[in-house]
Amino acid sequence: MRQHVNPLSINFNQIERIPSLGEMFGDSKLNLHLDIGCAAGEFLFDLALVNTSWNYLGIEIREKLVKNAKLKVLESEIKNLYFLFGNANNILNDVQSELIIKNLKSISFYFPDPWFKKRHYKRRVIQPEFINILSNLLQKGTLIFIKTDVKDLFDYMDYTISNNFYFKTIDKKDFNYSESFNPNKVKTNREKYVINNQLDIFERIYIKI
């Protein structure tokens, strides 16, 4: 069972130094995909091996998972993958590198903590304030992918993103993956579980305009 961590805890006010792209990756010029709430990082490990022409950055709020993922990267000598520990809201709000923003082409929020109780909705990763941060940081054309098996959470995320003027929904049927990055080449552990149990998956794609 996934351990929930309160992202509003004072423990996450301090963030680790954000390295430069050159420090994180073997080739800093590659396009960058960001996965927020990456857990142990298995999804990104698979993506990094399937598509070596991109760099992958995972942000996770559970420190032990990040430490283990970083160790695995070192042991496997993968050069296009890096992990950061902390609250994604704080980390992205602190990003000062224009190069990181220039290279960042897509972001995924896959099966985030649902925080079912209404009084805990403010702990959900996608909040109006966070989407405002992204609208100011991201370049036009940057993609956002969301995916969950919780309909209420999907509606909440979709409403929050769609109500920001700078993001437009893309019809999945009309989206040409051959012309863009496809994070659906591999599946997260949660997605595999959902598929095996024949549960519903709700997903949507947005583009910064």
UniProtKB/Swiss-Prot annotation:
Annotated keywords: Methyltransferase, S-adenosyl-L-methionine, Transferase, tRNA processing
Pathway in which the depicted protein is active: tRNA modification; N(7)-methylguanine-tRNA biosynthesis
Methyltransferase is among the record's keywords: yes
NCBIfam families attached to this UniProt entry: tRNA (guanosine(46)-N7)-methyltransferase TrmB (TIGR00091)
Residues annotated as signal peptide: none
Record-listed E.C. numbers: 2.1.1.33
Protein name: tRNA (guanine-N(7)-)-methyltransferase
Reaction catalysed by this enzyme: guanosine(46) in tRNA + S-adenosyl-L-methionine = N(7)-methylguanosine(46) in tRNA + S-adenosyl-L-homocysteine
InterPro entries for the chain: SAM-dependent_MTases_sf, tRNA_(Gua-N-7)_MeTrfase_Trmb, tRNA_methyltr_TrmB_bact
Record gene name: trmB
PANTHER family assigned: 3-DEOXY-D-MANNO-OCTULOSONIC-ACID TRANSFERASE/TRNA GUANINE-N 7 - -METHYLTRANSFERASE, TRNA (GUANINE-N(7)-)-METHYLTRANSFERASE
Active site (UniProt): 113
A GO cellular-component term linked to this record: tRNA methyltransferase complex
Protein function: Catalyzes the formation of N(7)-methylguanine at position 46 (m7G46) in tRNA.
Binding site residues for substrate: 117, 149
PROSITE patterns the record matches: SAM_MT_TRMB
Organism domain of life: Bacteria
Positions contributing to S-adenosyl-L-methionine binding: 35, 60, 87, 113
Pfam families: Methyltransf_4
A Gene Ontology molecular function term of the record: tRNA (guanine(46)-N7)-methyltransferase activity
EC top class, as a word: transferase
Entry's transmembrane regions: none
Family assignment from sequence similarity: Belongs to the class I-like SAM-binding methyltransferase superfamily. TrmB family.
